[in-house]
From Swiss-Prot:
Primary role: Catalyzes the attachment of isoleucine to tRNA(Ile). As IleRS can inadvertently accommodate and process structurally similar amino acids such as valine, to avoid such errors it has two additional distinct tRNA(Ile)-dependent editing activities. One activity is designated as 'pretransfer' editing and involves the hydrolysis of activated Val-AMP. The other activity is designated 'posttransfer' editing and involves deacylation of mischarged Val-tRNA(Ile).
HAMAP family: Ile_tRNA_synth_type1 (MF_02002)
Protein name: Isoleucine--tRNA ligase
A Pfam family reported for this protein in Swiss-Prot or TrEMBL: tRNA-synt_1
Amino acid sequence: MEEYKDTLNLNTTTFSMKGNLSVNEPKTYAKWQEQQAFKRMQARKDNHGDFTLHDGPPYANGHLHLGHALNKILKDIVVKREYFKGKKIYYTPGWDCHGLPIEQQILERLEKEKTSLENPTLFREKCRDHAKKFLEIQKNEFLQLGVLGDFEDPYKTMDFKFEASIYRALVEVAKKGLLKERHKPIYWSYACESALAEAEVEYKMKKSPSIFVAFGLKKESLEKLKVKKASLVIWTTTPWTLYANVAIALKKDAVYALTQKGYLVAKALHEKLAALGVVDNEITHEFNSNDLEYLVATNPLNQRDSLVALGEHVGLEDGTGAVHTAPGHGEEDYYLGLRYNLEVLMSVDEKGCYDEGIIHNQLLDESYLGEHVFKAQKRIIEQLGDSLLLEQEIEHSYPHCWRTHKPVIYRATTQWFILMDEPFIQNDGSQKTLREVALDAIEKVEFVPSSGKNRLKTMIENRPDWCLSRQRKWGVPLAFFIDKRTNKPCFESEVLEHVANLFEKKGCDVWWEYSVKDLLPPSYQEDAKHYEKIMHILDVWFDSGSTFKAVLEDYHGEKGQSPSDVILEGSDQHRGWFQSSLLIGCVLNNQAPFKKVITHGFIVDEKGEKMSKSKGNVVSLDKLLKTHGSDVVRLWVAFNDYQNDLRVSQTFFTQTEQHYKKFRNTLKFLLANFSDMDLKNLERPHNFSPLDHFMLETLETISAGVNSAFEEHDFVKGLNILMAFVTNELSGIYLDACKDSLYCDSKNNEKRQAIQMVLLATASKLCYFLAPILTHTIEEVLEHSQALRIFLQAKDVFDLKDISVSEKLHLKEFKKPENFEAVLALRSAFNEELDRLKKEGVIKNSLECAIEVKEKALDENLVEELLMVSFVGIAKEKLSETPAFTLFKAPFYKCPRCWRFKSELENTPCKRCEQVLKER
């Protein structure tokens, strides 16, 4: 039989089974950069509209990790998908360059070098150099992922023009009356010595003291209640704030119970508190909280008065129903203080230590001066004496600084805020608050997943005013002048635009370098002595939140349209970039700066735990790329439900590699089997068999399914449809049935040529759907197939576009085989019986069989093809019988060329093979 091997169509392709991705991909990516692939993508337009994905900036510090890869790969898939649909695409990657982490890096370096740098300009220069260094590192690492974008001209928040744009956005906020200076409690990082915005706070578990303290009512209050003794019992987990207590808040219209021992608590909580031993069991009096308002108690720590007030924030689920109130250390306390005109006491310095205010205001004795508040808590608790009713330790969720990961405190300071509830004029002349405008805007935005809408909505509903000012150096300054004659900020347009122009030309370092006079426009310079600079910098979330203006609006559409079609970030950005962008967009334009928000989860280990170096469960991105290649990493991203957290381990990547090999080997098989086709046959109509029609109709059906899934950004659903098709209909049915014709028929055989056209159409669809994900691999596929390039009219991957199979193959309709489901059912039953006969050693393969089918309406040729038997009909030697069919030994001899049992003489080719051999 060996002599016939060379007569078979055992075609090959130069497309390798092994991708050797880690070696070949960098060459491809270098070629794309050299050819300016992204510019070419932007130049192509098929009149299917524009698409802008606005990039949320990563921080220009450190190397990339797998979380960065997840985010950028998803963006790249979304952008390329829109590109291959024929849209003009815009995607400008960017970097967040200002902020505390870089400052800390520079300070640590200076400390190691044992040098100090008081000059703010030189310090900022070092910060800028650090950001530049890591920006370039990260840029090259992104390119290794096969990500394409305008990396030649990315946006950087530290560029002079960008800093000016950020400042101009701030000016708009000020002009609309939403920027105000306030003395109020805010999150304060004593580790960073700076204010924090809500987005810069993360919640982690922390152990804290939990204490119940009795505040005795003063004599006049006892007389009003007509009782001899009564103490309101408060519960707190921040004993260090007791020094600043000025009030006790009760729930409005609630019943409060006085016990025999004189403890006053909410009646709804009395039983629980008695069980803890905080109060005694017997109730002697009951009071409505409204009757307790304006009574006065005594703070046992410093004997200062504490007013009884009523607060909407007081709950009856935990605690005592009596809330310790210190307006200098809590936002709800602060707002209650405004209603009751309470004193704001705050005697804690930037480092979190008690300052001299504790002595001046007689809040604590001088031994506490300079002591950190958390360290002082033990002594404070001891000082309470008999007023301490119970002390425990609890573990609870507590705010921490997201940069230092240390606990934060609430501390009243003078800061600049964007006001959420101050009405301002809209485009239509009406007045709404920023909170109202933002909530209205959310309703017009699409969210993927849809749960993101309520998440963002709830955050906007409940968020406080936005604290903008930071007491640092590396950032855009809050560059306003205070007029010392009025003690008010100067918001004159001439002054503000002059500063903005200086920033655009020379960078905002000038705010530190120049004198007040040099920063003012000429017409104001005579009065320079009356002005002083505000020396705060802006919250970096304002930088990133105004990127839509700096990138999309300031370039007048050159870098994309505003509002952008899509923004795509991790789910943590609901409290970060999504909010800051939304709020600034609503101030500037009365609308969200984006139409759709897509969110993804986080990278966790195989157990679902967060990755950390201390746990030793970090998976190195660099190692993954070297082991598997970027296309496998990209496929892993797309083959996962990215809307939830993504589990990572070597096992998961090994599984993904198997998926990749399945796609690659399928494409290799397809390429090999139409590699010998006559290119003249590409455009002419073909006579397709019923089985071909089944395959082509299936191809169009699954194409619709994949397109639908990809439109919804459900890549895992689309890929599962594609993988099921490749495994079942393509490999499991069609290719098995066609191998005989592909290998053994004449090259000019019409049936074989029609099959090759089906394979070509299938390969083209696989290329189209996989190109946004496996861009390098599909580029490689096209390099190795001239037929595919001609069929798709694509010289490389960037020329790809969707095709209609029916139009391309001149088909007006698909003629699916009659009774096809019945033939497939027969095939399934046949394969079961075949396996049994193989195990018993009766036969070796299906070609040894003849089959008699009980259902006479079935097409015999189709049965022979799909079951891969040599004969359909009755033969002499019965092998087995089932209700649906009878199996016989094939009645003819084995053909030495095609191995089917169709030869009339032993060791002689069958009639088909004999004819093929004559034509050679």
